[in-house]
């Protein structure tokens, strides 16, 4: 299955909620979801009552779209989460939160995950001093993520830092914008990922069927 390359705002409208896929634009009056808060298409305004399966499916689709993950990879994340001890919901969230593209976004070096994925793919970041250009790379506690020296003047990175420098970071991360680096201190707790508008338990139930 190919990665979706169409308008990001259509994904928000399809899921019936803001997924904040376009960064700061989502907070402005240019946000398409604010203007048309219904699904795209001729029947988008019609409200449909979802079955339990439909609710579970929508939860899965929403989480996949937030993190930009395709089905095969997302299923692998679930399978890893299910095999680990502890709360499977939290394990699944950790799997997607520790992706390098997500960590770059969370640290504030990109305005959204899509841009973070592109920046990582183009080799603009180091992990523990070594270049990593795989967006799905799994970051470990204690890993240092930094912008490559020759990439520090790239506009998307400079603009993101300017936008995010006064914002609070997630508690499992630390960042030093002056030196263009951050640390993935530890894995997040489920309750700490406060901006994830998804019933993760519904996803677990869907894959457990």
From Swiss-Prot:
Q: Which Pfam families match?
A: Ribosomal_S4, S4
A GO molecular-function term, please?
Answer: rRNA binding
> What's the protein called, per UniProt?
Small ribosomal subunit protein uS4
Q: Which NCBIfam families is this protein grouped with?
A: PRK05327.1, rpsD_bact
Keyword Ribonucleoprotein among record annotations: yes
Q: Which PANTHER family match?
A: 30S 40S RIBOSOMAL PROTEIN, SMALL RIBOSOMAL SUBUNIT PROTEIN US4M
Q: Which PROSITE patterns match?
A: S4
Q: One biological process GO term for this chain?
A: translation
Q: Where is the S4 RNA-binding domain?
A: 98-164
Q: What does this protein do?
A: One of the primary rRNA binding proteins, it binds directly to 16S rRNA where it nucleates assembly of the body of the 30S subunit. With S5 and S12 plays an important role in translational accuracy.
* Assembly mode: Part of the 30S ribosomal subunit. Contacts protein S5. The interaction surface between S4 and S5 is involved in control of translational fidelity.
Similarity-based family: Belongs to the universal ribosomal protein uS4 family.
Q: Which GO terms describe its cellular component?
A: small ribosomal subunit
What SMART domains would the database entry show?
Ribosomal_S4, S4
The alphabetical list of record keywords is: Ribonucleoprotein, Ribosomal protein, RNA-binding, rRNA-binding
Q: Tell me the organism.
A: Thermosipho melanesiensis (strain DSM 12029 / CIP 104789 / BI429)
Q: Which residues form the signal peptide?
A: none
């Amino acid at each position: 299955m190919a990665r979706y390359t169409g308008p990001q705002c259509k994904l928000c409208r399809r899921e019936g909620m803001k997924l904040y896929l376009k960064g700061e634009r989502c907070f402005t009056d240019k946000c398409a979801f604010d203007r048309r808060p219904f699904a795209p298409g001729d029947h988008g305004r019609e409200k449909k009552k979802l079955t339990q399966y439909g609710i579970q499916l929508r939860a899965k689709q929403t989480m996949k779209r937030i993190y930009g993950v395709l089905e095969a990879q997302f299923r692998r994340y679930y399978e890893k989460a299910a095999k680990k001890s502890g709360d499977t919901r939290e394990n699944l969230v950790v799997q997607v939160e520790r992706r390098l593209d997500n960590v770059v976004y969370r640290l504030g070096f990109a305005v959204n995950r899509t841009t973070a994925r592109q920046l990582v793919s183009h080799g603009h970041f180091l992990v523990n001093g070594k270049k990593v250009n795989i967006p799905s790379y799994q970051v470990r506690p204690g890993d240092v993520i930094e912008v490559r020296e020759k990439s520090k003047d790239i506009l998307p990175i400079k603009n993101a830092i300017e936008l995010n420098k006064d914002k609070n970071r997630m508690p499992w991360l630390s960042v030093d914008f002056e030196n263009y680096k951050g640390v993935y201190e530890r894995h997040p707790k489920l309750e700490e990922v406060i901006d994830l508008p998804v019933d993760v338990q519904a996803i677990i139930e869907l894959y457990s069927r």
